[in-house]
């Protein structure tokens, strides 16, 4: 088996190993990336997801590299070489899969969790992912974003105000 084929088989095997049960859709809210902001108190980047009905938002603190990746995709500003999220998109596509949706599923001990739902030749696969990585992939693939309803009530973090230097949609 050629090295490239072996690599693709190993990636597909890893995706299958991460398979878990499908999550319920009844308690999910469709959201979109509203903006990337900086937390005024810490200077940390925050991705703000807004309920598509426009009445609620959820702020998730993320890393600078992920914020840069999300912002560059929001503004269609592609670097000359692929970053990690571009690579993941390419691997999924080359394995004849697609990202069907992303769901931010829970908040546990101050950390948000999400799943990347993939349609693969063998069926649907849910892969645990950091929300920032899952959001970056959703933006690159056009996959819809969802947040579990309970997370809007569970968070007590204020959404950072919008400033002039933020990356908005």
For every predicted segment, state its role.
Residues 7-17:
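Bacterial N-terminal signal peptides
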């Amino acid at each position: 088996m050629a090295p490239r084929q072996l690599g693709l088989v190993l990636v597909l095997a890893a995706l299958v190993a991460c398979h878990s049960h499908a999550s319920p859709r009844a308690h999910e809210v469709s959201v979109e990336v509203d903006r990337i902001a900086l937390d005024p108190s810490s200077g940390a980047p925050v991705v703000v997801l807004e309920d598509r009905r426009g009445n609620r938002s959820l702020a998730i603190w993320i890393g600078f590299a992920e914020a840069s990746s999300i912002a560059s995709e929001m503004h269609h500003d592609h670097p000359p070489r692929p970053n990690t999220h571009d690579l993941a998109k390419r691997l999924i596509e080359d394995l004849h899969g697609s990202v069907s949706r992303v769901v931010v599923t829970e908040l546990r001990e101050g950390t948000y969790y999400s799943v990347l739902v993939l349609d693969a030749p063998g069926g649907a696969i849910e892969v645990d992912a950091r929300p920032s990585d899952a959001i970056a992939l959703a933006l690159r693939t056009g996959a819809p974003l969802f947040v579990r309803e309970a997370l809007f009530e569970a968070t007590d973090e204020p959404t950072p105000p919008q400033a002039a230097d933020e990356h908005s949609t």
